[in-house]
Amino acid sequence: MVRSAIGVVVGVVAWVVGFWILAILLAQLWPDYAVHGRQWTREGVFTFTAPMACCNLVAWLLAEIGAGWVAGRIARRGGAVWVLAGLLGVYLAVVHFALYWSRFPWWYDLGVVIPAVPAGTTTPTLYHHGKRGQ
């Protein structure tokens, strides 16, 4: 139980850190992305172009997969991965569907929220540990 809780907490941290690392890397490779990223972090204004926003969607997806993997490795139980995926899904749904729907393009809101739970549970750790009963 303790390992599961630690796995979920570390998974959330991995999710945030993973996205920011990918975003910083993208900003280093694409200077115009960096300009829009700074505008988002300073003013909360979403000015990313469609290709930039699609790169954000890929970064969120990769961060969710990585977070699920980290949580599964630490917890050694598939249940922790599902809890993490559920928490991320609920958090993103509240942020993108209730609080900030009008701040983002509709397709971006859907692109962030819909794959959150499936992406977080696609980690091989979930299936390997679940089959062995560990």
Regions inferred by a protein language model and the residue ranges of each:
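Juxtamembrane/disordered regions of integral membrane proteins
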Residues: 1-134
